[in-house]
A protein has these predicted regions:
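Short solvent-exposed coil/turn linkers within tandem alpha-helical repeat scaffolds
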Residues: 39-42, 73-82, 110-121, 147-156, ...
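Alpha-helical segment of the N-proximal tetratricopeptide repeat
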Residues: 44-78, 91, 95
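Hydrophobic alpha-helical membrane segments
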Residues: 84, 98, 118-121, 128, ...
Length: 322
């Protein structure tokens, strides 16, 4: 009888212990649910998430901002600000110098939205990102795609204008003129095309050096450098090559054939370097003068584009040097 009572008491105490442990846990769980329901700060809302991403963007914490914009799009895909969030993702990458990632983000937007304010801006930013990557051909393709898809004359004219300046950047003057001429008459004053055409015509008088002539002149050591207006290099080349030639001649004249052969071998290397250096100097001279011309042209005539697609306008900014 005693043994039976023992078997009955043991399960009873086990049940009591387990029940007493479960009650606080269940109350804690229920309390946490009620706390989250009663505390609005713990609830993810579209406004809070978007504003948080905006604050990060304003603080120039671009990479974190991009992630928070992505989180906003993931949780609230039907929110009317999704397109803006996508654009800001692209801008976050662009402003942080990650141009290839920016291109991917902007392209994603242009595939999802058509002829909206931010899709058109995205086309422009894609071309600018490619320019920063020195991928000028890709920048031209992007803007030509915009020309094809848009039905807005103002947008098309701005694309033509941007294309023209890319061609100026790579010194393709005739192509630049061709695209500037495509701009409609109503926007010709907006982009100051008459003044631009007059300044662009000055490319014909950019100082140039002929690389072939520089090489031929270098038959006389230093003459090629002198032609390219590198006077110090011309003097050094003349003295060095002249000295080696004279030393080799003296060695052979005194029957020091080994020394003469060595000096001839060394001298030939310097002589070839004199020719190559002169040709390279001509190319550098031309690039430098072209860059100076492009810089002055941009400073004096380029319109500072600030897209205002709602009002169909641009902010015009000119700088003149005298």
């Amino acid at each position: 009888m005693q043994i039976r009572n023992t078997y009955l008491v043991f399960p009873f105490f086990t049940f009591v212990i387990l029940f007493s442990l479960f009650i606080p846990f269940s109350q804690s769980f229920a309390g946490s649910e009620s706390q989250s329901a009663s505390d609005p700060s713990l609830i993810l809302s579209p406004d809070k998430q978007f504003n948080y991403a905006q604050d990060l963007f304003s603080a120039k914490d671009y990479l974190t901002a991009a992630n928070e914009y992505k989180r906003f799009i993931y949780f609230f895909p039907k929110d009317k600000r999704v397109e803006l969030a996508m654009y800001r993702i692209g801008m976050s990458h662009y402003l942080s110098g990650h141009y290839q990632e920016a291109v991917s983000a902007f392209e994603k937007l242009t595939k999802q939205y058509f002829e909206t304010e931010y899709s058109i801006k995205s086309y422009y930013k894609i071309s600018e990102a490619y320019i920063n990557l020195k991928a000028f051909d890709q920048a031209l393709i992007d803007l030509n795609n915009l020309v094809i898809v848009t039905h807005d004359d103002d947008v098309r004219d701005e694309a033509y204008y941007r294309i023209g300046w890319i061609y100026i950047e790579i010194a393709s003057w005739d192509e630049a003129r061709r695209y500037f001429n495509k701009i409609s008459t109503k926007n010709s004053y907006k982009y100051k095309l008459e003044r631009l055409a007059a300044e662009l015509d000055k490319e014909k008088v950019i100082p140039k050096k002929d690389p072939k002539l520089a090489g031929v002149l270098s038959i006389v050591p230093g003459a090629g450098y002198l032609y390219c207006e590198r006077y110090q290099d011309a003097l050094i080349s003349f003295l060095l090559n002249g000295g080696l030639i004279y030393a080799a001649y003296e060695s052979f004249d005194k029957d020091h054939y080994g020394l003469g052969g060595l000096l001839t071998f060394v001298g030939f290397g310097f002589y070839a370097g004199n020719i190559y250096g002169a040709v390279t100097s001509a190319h550098k001279f031309n690039r430098k003068e072209t860059d100076k011309f492009i810089y002055k042209l941009e400073k004096n005539t380029r319109v500072n584009l600030s897209a205002d697609l709602k009002n169909k306008g641009v902010l015009l900014s000119f700088r003149f040097s005298f």
